[in-house]
Design a protein with these regions (language model features):
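Alpha-helical segment of the N-proximal tetratricopeptide repeat
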Residues: 16-55, 66
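Register position in tetratricopeptide repeats
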Residues: 32-33, 66-67, 100, 130-133
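Canonical positions in the second alpha-helix
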Residues: 45-46, 79-80, 113-114
């Protein structure tokens, strides 16, 4: 089935918007309460219904980051960046994930992109220092 996308939107319109907003709020609440296992399940279910939900992709990736599953986190960060390619928070966690996997070249690429957006970003400067640059 082909989903048609709106004229100015990169994502398809959500046919079950009210229910998905409710699920998103539940997901955020679980995350805020640090119930990561439940939040991960809730976020994954939400992404099955709304696969292009930028914030949910970032938050699920963040949970995987906290669980030290950096490769899995990066896949969610990449999907999130397909929607919002200049999201500094996503880029920064992706850079940290690459650093944890000793993929310094990729971490540097993320840092360079952040510097294009925010040249004075302190976490990026610190990360680049840690990477000996």
């Amino acid at each position: 089935m082909i989903d048609l996308v709106g004229l100015f939107s990169r994502t398809p319109k959500d046919p079950d918007l009210k229910n998905n907003i409710k699920k998103y709020k539940e997901f955020k609440k679980l995350l805020k309460e640090k119930k990561y296992a439940e939040a991960l399940k809730s976020g994954t279910e939400l992404l099955r219904k709304v696969p292009h939900h930028h914030d949910a992709l970032f938050m699920v990736g963040s949970i995987y980051y906290l669980k030290n599953k950096y490769g899995t986190a990066i896949t969610f960060f990449d999907r999130s960046l397909e929607i919002g390619e200049y999201d500094i928070d996503v880029l920064l966690l992706k850079a940290y994930s690459h650093q944890k996997l000793s993929e310094n070249k990729r971490a540097i690429q993320c840092c360079e992109k952040i510097k294009e957006i925010d040249p004075k970003n302190k976490p990026v400067q610190q990360l680049l220092t840690e990477l000996d640059l």
